[in-house]
Amino acid sequence: KVFVDKLATFQAKFPEAHLGAVVAFGSTVWRHLSGGEGAEELKDFIPYGKGLAPATQYDVLIHILSLRHDVNFSVAQAAIEAFGDSIDVQEEIHGFRWVEERDLSGFVDGTENPAGEETRREVAVIKDGVDAGGSYVFVQRWEHNLRQLNRMSVHDQEMMIGRTKDANEEIDGDARPVTSHLSRVDLKEDGKGLKIVRQSLPYGTASGTHGLY
């Protein structure tokens, strides 16, 4: 409640920043806070491979997003103050918007994202039951090896992704590998496409670790 009130104050003070924030809870702490009620599909992430996709399983995620880094920073400070000793910050990542909404790989990210606030609500917000108004968050932090990527030809990069790099056009299904990123994430259930709202941004430093969060 304290953080929500502080967030509302910042939103009123900086309307042009289009500020928003989400507080999400991991499976274990949510079961404790809710008494086991709701969030039936909330589960711990199962790690994949030897370090390829580790499971961190943090208890709380605070995601802050706006058009101004200074506002984001101030809201993050307010969040830490509001939660106080009840949390111990394990990781703090600052993302940024890159050229033409592209990932550091040079490809446009989130092309198929649902457009418009109402459509996004329809896709992501739970409508009924004890979880009404809530949602699920799936967090992945990718580390990019851009040197290795840039050793590939643009054509090979496009075949790997499933879209053209400059024009951001989808490559026909028959012309792209079944192992391409686009082919793997084009999921359907009962013939209907499964949609998510992506909020990913590039992050990191030029001389150190960088990628997509």
Residue ranges and their predicted role:
Residues 1-213:
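Long, histidine/aromatic-enriched segments associated with O2/redox biology
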